[in-house]
Amino acid sequence: MKPVKKKKTEEPELEPLCCCEYIDRNGEKNHVAACLCDCQDLDEGCDRWLTCQSLRPETCERITDTISDRLRIPWLRGAKKVNISIVPPLVLLPVFLHVASWHFLLGVVVLTSLPMLALWYYYLTHRRKEQTLFFLSLGLFSLGYMYYVFLREVVPQGRVGPTQLALLTCGLLLILLALYRAKKNPGYLSNDKSPSNSQIECPVKKGQEKTKGFPGTDASGSLNNRTLKDDVRGSSRVGLDSPAKVKEDWCAKCQLVRPARAWHCRICGICVRRMDHHCVWINSCVGESNHQAFILALSIFLLTSVYGISLTLNTICRDRSLFTALFYCPGVYANYSSALSFTCVWYSVIITAGMAYIFLIQLINISYNVTEREVQQALRQKTGRRLLCGLIVDTGQYNRGFLRNWLQFSTLGTHTVHTPAEDIV
């Protein structure tokens, strides 16, 4: 008898998702309308809370994961997941500002608490080394909401002309354009080296293990009398005998050769060329390719913010100077419109003061040709020259004078110095 050929079982084709359906974290099809169904972890957490029992950490993590997975909006070909960290600013900021405009004392309490809550959340996420869209959402929504209050409460009073409104609108648009440019690639290092340079398998010697890296790297990971741990922690990449000579280091995490002043960002999980710092306000690193756009965004924001604050105070506190109106504006709480505008002014002042401090630090660092990461490393290791209680730190490694430092900053990203890997072995 001839053997019977078995027919190949055809896998069923997946049906296209409608706008409200999605594939959840368990790989099953789910619906947006069922977001409150089958919440075992949430039920368990509520039961333990009602019975005054402690909630286990793993239960809290599962509840957070479930909420973030089910928080979606209808979209074409399936519901899209919404990052839960962008929601609190959209909901809480208008509520807090409206509550603060009810009374002077409420305004003091709320406007004092907001920076503290933001700092608490920053240190919480910074300690976990996690990316968050909270601060980017807070910044963008603050810009939009302040502009909305200005159009609704300040412009109708007739003291803001069309030219002034056009200037403020152009400033807002320029801020968004500069932020868009600053959000782009800060100078990520890609692992495009050849295998002979980036992944060299060392021969096995007696007393050594097979490792990947540069020739001469033993089992302890030493490289040129330094360990890979030192490279990850940020050992100096400038030779003592020739400070101007650029050397390159090996990143054990990205498995690539990084040039001088590059650093591995533990939040982004990738190496950045001439990394300055990881900025939570743009949810990205500030590096060689976007440092100029970052400074431009800060400068435009400060000018636009001060201009908007002055226009608002001249409208609600007439015939008073800008500084006097901030602290003494009689009758500002007499009606709700002026009270809300005055509260938004003080909120803008707090944000502007914080950004002005960041801008000042950036100007000082550029003038001394140091990055923020190099400053923090010098403060920890108690090296370099410190002035004004550590506000100014000069490491002395790359400082070539004020004009040359700014000239080098103005040409960032236009050329890149490459050093062969053989030169550092």
UniProtKB/Swiss-Prot annotation:
One of the protein's GO biological processes: protein localization to plasma membrane
High-level lineage: Eukaryota, Metazoa, Chordata, Craniata, Vertebrata
Residues forming the catalytic site: C279
UniProt GO cellular component terms: Golgi membrane
Chain ranges on the Lumenal side, renumbered to this chain: 100-102, 152-159, 314-343
TM spans (from-to): 82-99, 103-125, 131-151, 160-180, 293-313, 344-364
MF terms (GO), sorted A to Z: protein-cysteine S-palmitoyltransferase activity
Record InterPro entries: Palmitoyltrfase_DHHC, PFA4/ZDH16/20/ERF2-like
The keyword Nucleus is assigned to this record: no
Tissue: Expressed in the brain.
Function: Palmitoyltransferase that could catalyze the addition of palmitate onto various protein substrates and be involved in a variety of cellular processes. Palmitoyltransferase that mediates palmitoylation of KCNMA1, regulating localization of KCNMA1 to the plasma membrane. May be involved in NOS1 regulation and targeting to the synaptic membrane.
Family statement drawn from the similarity comment of this UniProt entry: Belongs to the DHHC palmitoyltransferase family.
Compartment(s) of residence: Golgi apparatus membrane; Golgi apparatus, trans-Golgi network membrane
Pfam families in alphabetical order: DHHC (PF01529)
The protein's name in its UniProt record: Palmitoyltransferase ZDHHC23
Broad class of where this protein is predominantly found: Golgi
Signal peptide (UniProt feature, chain positions): none
Record organism: Mus musculus
Region feature (Interaction with NOS1): 422-425
Cytoplasmic side: 1-81, 126-130, 181-292, 365-425
